[in-house]
């Protein structure tokens, strides 16, 4: 199994060598289509997503060295300023913690900064023109389309073979995280598609719906229309957080 993920990392590395934005597109596919239970053990005790983010970070540093990206440009970007402001609020929230000790909170925040705050900063820094933005949007669209079609497919066949296999493979490392591939709520069969848990998928789907529906209204393209329809269906069959 590790060989497959090494191939994914290798592809990401090659894409980043060409342009960092290509690696960011690879991260989009990985975040949406590969559950976060996938680890790089025994090579390293980190998730596949963290490995991809690390590669992107290396090449973003390269872009800074060769002035393809400037610190002034990053700091002056309104979107990145908002992210940094949010990061400062998270740091201040440590003072309000009641359940965890200080060292644990720092560890959780460090992981959150790496996996959730750094990627959007890297994406914004890597987009240099409209073509880059369209490429990233197309990657999101394709990933959402695959994710929603597969989610509908799992409900039709009554099982989630992809997630079941990954849960079975990583059970020794994440036995507490294993959940049924399909669940039932109020008599409705629900699924989590390519996400580890339906809660995560349920959080993702409304955001995906807003994005694809907005661009359908903007472009009137049939691909956006079908993705909007599939996303709408999945919001109902997820049964969690939607």
State where each predicted segment sits.
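Transmembrane signal-anchor hairpin modules in multi-pass inner-membrane enzymes, especially those
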Residues: 1-92, 104, 131, 138, ...
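Membrane-water interface at transmembrane helix exits
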Residues: 30, 62, 97, 123-128, ...
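Hydrophobic cores of alpha-helical transmembrane segments in multi-pass inner/ER membrane proteins
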Residues: 52-62, 115-124, 204-213
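Membrane-interface helix caps and helix-loop-helix hairpins in membrane proteins
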Residues: 40-41, 98-107, 236-237
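Alpha-helical transmembrane segments of multi-pass inner-membrane proteins
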Residues: 8-13, 88-95, 118, 137-167, ...
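Aromatic-anchored transmembrane helix interface
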Residues: 50-51, 81, 85-88, 102-125, ...
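Juxtamembrane membrane-interface segments at transmembrane alpha-helix termini
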Residues: 22, 34-45, 117-124, 149-154, ...
